UniProtKB/Swiss-Prot annotation:
Known partners and oligomeric status: The Tat system comprises two distinct complexes: a TatABC complex, containing multiple copies of TatA, TatB and TatC subunits, and a separate TatA complex, containing only TatA subunits. Substrates initially bind to the TatABC complex, which probably triggers association of the separate TatA complex to form the active translocon.
Organism domain of life: Bacteria
One annotated GO biological process: protein transport by the Tat complex
Cystine crosslinks: none
Official protein name in the record: Sec-independent protein translocase protein TatB
Organism: Verminephrobacter eiseniae (strain EF01-2)
An annotated Gene Ontology molecular function: protein transmembrane transporter activity
Keyword entries, A-Z: Cell inner membrane, Cell membrane, Membrane, Protein transport, Translocation, Transmembrane, Transmembrane helix, Transport
Keyword Acyltransferase in annotation: no
Membrane topology (UniProt): Single-pass membrane protein
Length: 154
């Protein structure tokens, strides 16, 4: 901030000792130190704010360039899509129907395959379910402990 050498600091200290006196000098030095600290923090805050505003300006410029590029891409896609639609309409209009195909064939109807997955799943043999670990009933932890506790007669 301010460039003061060691000799200048000693001269300022000697003048302050003579003018203020040895009793009040520590309190004045603390006050001056506090004020200098506040001034340095204020300058740092101002610098940070200026940097932030400069970055915002740069980001706004970048945003504008990206938006203009996106607008150009959108316009080019729009023009090519309209040209394609125009060509497609011309191709459809110019395509003449064949002489023998005056009758239109209806599109085939969708027929559900009818696989019935759940029925097939339940139709598995019981021995296969037992070996592959398919559970038909779920047990809670407490019920499992009560059922499989060793050494207790029922």
């Amino acid at each position: 901030m301010i460039d003061i050498g060691l000799s200048k600091m000693a001269l300022i200290g000697a003048v302050a000792l003579i003018v203020i006196g040895p009793e009040k000098l520590p309190r004045v030095a603390r006050t001056v130190g506090t004020l200098l600290g506040k001034a340095q923090r204020y300058v740092a805050d101002v610098k940070a704010e200026v940097n932030r505003s400069m970055e915002l300006d740069e980001l706004k410029k970048m945003k504008d360039t990206v938006e203009s590029a996106a607008r150009e891409v959108h316009d080019s896609i729009q023009t090519s899509a309209s040209a394609f639609e125009k060509d497609w309409a011309e191709a459809i209009d110019s395509a003449a129907p064949l002489p023998g195909s005056t009758a239109t064939v209806p599109a085939p109807e969708y027929k559900h395959p009818g696989k019935r997955w759940r029925l097939k799943r339940s139709a598995l043999p019981q021995w296969y379910k037992a070996r592959s670990g398919v559970r038909s009933k779920a047990l809670s932890g407490a019920a499992r402990v009560a059922r499989y506790r060793p050494g207790k007669s029922r």
